[in-house]
């Protein structure tokens, strides 16, 4: 569409179209003080945003090996940002979270659900 002889743009100039694209490659953003509180027992209920994650196993072979920091979390997906932005489905992967001094493997099916709803779930201990 043209207005006053000029072409309209779909988005603001200089801004990326995909969420998280502007922080790709900037790992320093995710250094937080909350990491010490995450343990093997409470990671299912804990906030995942900001944690370093790596896909260990997946039903789709291209997902294996993706690593980065968790940028966003929805009901069925995790958005990982490393050298680029990846949207990873939770229910088909096994994810390893790196907490600095320990690595925790979690089946993605245990993470399915909105973060606030996972708190209400009862898990067998």
UniProtKB/Swiss-Prot annotation:
Gene3D superfamilies: Ribonuclease P/MRP, subunit p29 (2.30.30.210)
Keyword tRNA processing: yes
Keywords: Cytoplasm, Endonuclease, Hydrolase, Nuclease, tRNA processing
GO terms classed as biological process: tRNA 5'-leader removal
EC number, UniProt record: 3.1.26.5
Keyword tRNA processing tagged: yes
GO MF assignments: ribonuclease P activity; RNA binding
Cell compartments where the protein resides: Cytoplasm
SUPFAM superfamilies to which the protein is assigned, alphabetical: Rof/RNase P subunit-like
InterPro entries tied to this protein: RNase_P/MRP_Rpp29_sf (IPR036980), RNP1 (IPR023538), Rof/RNase_P-like (IPR023534), Rpp29/RNP1 (IPR002730)
Any single GO CC term annotated in Swiss-Prot or TrEMBL for this entry: ribonuclease P complex
Catalytic activity: Endonucleolytic cleavage of RNA, removing 5'-extranucleotides from tRNA precursor
Alphabetized Pfam families for the sequence: RNase_P-MRP_p29
Major localisation: cytoplasm
Residues passing through the membrane, by range: none
Stretches for region Disordered: 1-22
Protein's job: Part of ribonuclease P, a protein complex that generates mature tRNA molecules by cleaving their 5'-ends.
Family indicated by similarity: Belongs to the eukaryotic/archaeal RNase P protein component 1 family.
Subunit structure comment from the entry: Consists of a catalytic RNA component and at least 4-5 protein subunits.
HAMAP family: RNase_P_1 (MF_00754)
Protein name per UniProt: Ribonuclease P protein component 1
Gene name of the record: rnp1
